[in-house]
Amino acid sequence: MADRLTQLQDAVNSLADQFCNAIGVLQQCGPPASFSNIQTAINKDQPANSTEEYAQLFAALIARTAKDIDVLIDSLPSEESTAALQAASLYKLEEENHEAATCLEDVVYRGDMLLEKIQSALADIAQSQLKTRSGTHSQSLPDS
């Protein structure tokens, strides 16, 4: 996973791509403007509603990417962060890490206990199958 600065750069690049694509679609689908009595043929092949759909699509993409950029910027450490604040934050993270490690150890212990029970049950099943088979073989053999 990339660090936050790389994610931020990727989001800014994505936003720039979306702006370029939106401008390209507007140039392609938009009606021509009239300049000083110059007559041009209007391309009527393009339906008007597709232009609106493109506008809505690009507006949604640009808004979502801008929101992602805001979230990434907010997650960056601030310049006002003092050494004491950073130490407190680090201490809190270490506590959370310790709690998660304790929880993980408990889950692993319970998993090991379940594994032992399953292995014991499988061994019992295998033993009973062996006894059943050996009992059937001894009964099917004729006595001499």
Swiss-Prot record:
- GO CC field: mediator complex
Main localization of the protein described in the UniProt heading: nucleus
Annotated Gene Ontology MF terms?
transcription coregulator activity
Q: Which UniProt keywords apply?
A: Activator, Nucleus, Transcription, Transcription regulation
The keyword ATP-binding is annotated on this UniProt entry: no
Q: Name one Pfam family in it.
A: Med21
Where it sits in the cell: the answer is: Nucleus
What are the GO BP annotations of this UniProt entry?
A: regulation of transcription by RNA polymerase II
InterPro entries noted in UniProt: Med7/Med21-like, Mediator_Med21
Q: Which SUPFAM superfamilies match?
A: Mediator hinge subcomplex-like
Similarity-based family: Belongs to the Mediator complex subunit 21 family.
Self-association state and partner proteins as the record states? Component of the Mediator complex, which is composed of MED1, MED4, MED6, MED7, MED8, MED9, MED10, MED11, MED12, MED13, MED13L, MED14, MED15, MED16, MED17, MED18, MED19, MED20, MED21, MED22, MED23, MED24, MED25, MED26, MED27, MED29, MED30, MED31, CCNC, CDK8 and CDC2L6/CDK11. The MED12, MED13, CCNC and CDK8 subunits form a distinct module termed the CDK8 module. Mediator containing the CDK8 module is less active than Mediator lacking this module in supporting transcriptional activation.
Query: Known PANTHER family for this protein?
Result: MEDIATOR OF RNA POLYMERASE II TRANSCRIPTION SUBUNIT 21, RNA POLYMERASE II HOLOENZYME COMPONENT SRB7
Q: What does this protein do?
A: Component of the Mediator complex, a coactivator involved in the regulated transcription of nearly all RNA polymerase II-dependent genes. Mediator functions as a bridge to convey information from gene-specific regulatory proteins to the basal RNA polymerase II transcription machinery. Mediator is recruited to promoters by direct interactions with regulatory proteins and serves as a scaffold for the assembly of a functional preinitiation complex with RNA polymerase II and the general transcription factors.
Q: What is this protein called?
A: Mediator of RNA polymerase II transcription subunit 21
What is the originating organism of this protein?
Pongo abelii
